[in-house]
Amino acid sequence: MFSTKQVVLSSLLFISSIYTSNVNGKNLSVFGAFFGSPNDNDNAREHCCSPRNKFHLTSFSSGCDLQKEVECLRAECKKSKECCNVVSLCSGLSECEYVEKTCDAIKQYYQKQAINTDVKITLVLKWIYKCMNTTSRAKLAVFTAHAIFNTSAFACLEAEGTWKYRSRGLLAIQGEKNYGLLTSYSRNRENFKECPHRLADLNCDVISVTVDWWYRNVGKCCKDYFGSLEILKPTEWTALKKNCADRESARRLENRRRLYEILVRCYE
């Protein structure tokens, strides 16, 4: 006769064998797809994406020999021409999701009905997604909220005035020091210090160097939206910190926060 302990142990081993399969010589657990394991790495946990199922993947590729299917979140595999053999569930956004959901957020905030047909906005969002090089909903939401609010949905990229180093670009970057940093980050050796007006150009190279500036000066120091305000110091935030905010500053600060919250809801 088997003891109760032996019966329980045998049952657990049996269940484990059902929910675990071998892929490319590596044991892969369905539960591990949800929760991960200490042996996981970022590449191993990349999201599967079937070319036949652009938005949802309800069945795995032939290389994913699993006994039970797990509903995948929408995301694109980094290997564009093949589905990864390791199944995982990520909470990130694919490029398609990011663009679609961000356009929805812009439409909600600005109350524009035809925002999804705006080719310019779609193209800029694709550039932002590629340059950000992350699928993190949280990171994308913070950066995108500031970029959209600062530029009125990419329509205004330069502040009024005559100061050479006035606010420009997606993040309303200003000051001679910051323009010098942008120059040092530029992969194309663009001299933003000598030609600061270039920061108001809306192209992939400018977005790339702007994202570099973000990661080096904001992203590494803050963990959330309010932390980013402390570093970016938009005029309305600075006025609030100095206890000299007027009604307009308060309104702008509230609108900036509201846009961020709309993005967060759309990304859920």
Swiss-Prot record:
- Leader peptide range in chain numbering: 1-25
Glycosylated residues in this chain: 27, 133, 150
Biological process annotations from GO: sporulation resulting in formation of a cellular spore
Q: Per UniProt, which keywords does this protein have?
A: Glycoprotein, Signal, Sporulation
**Any one GO cellular component localisation term in the record:** spore wall
Subcellular location(s): the record lists: Spore wall
The main place the protein resides is other
The short motif HBM is annotated over: 77-82
The free-text domain remark for this protein reads: Heparin-binding motifs (HBMs) are characterized by an XBBXBX or XBBBXXBX sequence, where X is any neutral amino acid and B is a positively charged basic amino acid, and are defined as the consensus sequence necessary for protein-heparin interactions.
Any idea what this protein is called? Spore wall protein 25
Q: Please give the organism.
A: Nosema bombycis (strain CQ1 / CVCC 102059) (Microsporidian parasite)
